[in-house]
Amino acid sequence: MQIFVKTLTGKTITLEVESSDTIDNVKAKIQDKEGIPPDQQRLIFAGKQLEDGRTLADYNIQKESTLHLVLRLRGGTMIKVKTLTGKEIEIDIEPTDTIDRIKERVEEKEGIPPVQQRLIYAGKQLADDKTAKDYAIEGGSVLHLVLALRGGLL
């Protein structure tokens, strides 16, 4: 099937894909056509950033759908947040982002309110007002998400 990828400059790229193709595959096809490295590509559909390991079918992307391509400038950092179920959520951050901002990004993707999130990195619980840089969180870092149960103090 054919899908379209629209860039911020307004250019539209036509791609031949299968619904079983992963977002990784689509980014590789964009690289073949446009020379843009996959790690600088962000694909958006229906207002959501598409995750690399998912397929077009996972996002209900059908023939003649239009994806939007946003380029990620170097300096942005891709980290992962791992849940207790083992699910990994990819989040694009800046070193100056606060932990609270990272929790907001987790909420955007997973619907978990920041107040219920505890983020752990290098064995430490992260304080909301500190930045990624304060904890030396960099590209490829994996944070662990633990949910704080509702209720009073123990």
UniProtKB/Swiss-Prot annotation:
Gene Ontology biological process: ubiquitin-dependent protein catabolic process
Position of the Glycyl lysine isopeptide (Gly-Lys) (interchain with K-? in acceptor proteins) cross-link: G76, G152
All copies of domain Ubiquitin-like, residue ranges: 1-76, 77-152
Organs and tissues of expression: Expressed in leaves, stems and flowers.
Key word Transit peptide present: no
GO CC, alphabetical: endoplasmic reticulum; nucleus
CDD domains hit by this protein: Ubl_NEDD8, Ubl_ubiquitin
Propeptide stretches in the record: 153-154
Keywords of this entry: Cytoplasm, Isopeptide bond, Nucleus, Repeat, Ubl conjugation pathway
Coiled-coil region: none
Gene3D superfamilies hit by this protein: Phosphatidylinositol 3-kinase Catalytic Subunit, Chain A, domain 1
Note: Ubiquitin is encoded by 16 different genes. Ubiquitin is generally synthesized as a polyubiquitin precursor with tandem head to tail repeats. Often, there is one to three additional amino acids after the last repeat, removed in the mature protein. Alternatively, ubiquitin extension protein is synthesized as a single copy of ubiquitin fused to a ribosomal protein (either L40 or S27A) or to a ubiquitin-related protein (either RUB1 or RUB2). Following translation, extension protein is cleaved from ubiquitin.
Family recorded in the similarity comment: Belongs to the ubiquitin family.
Name of the protein this chain belongs to: Ubiquitin-NEDD8-like protein RUB2
Organism of origin: Arabidopsis thaliana
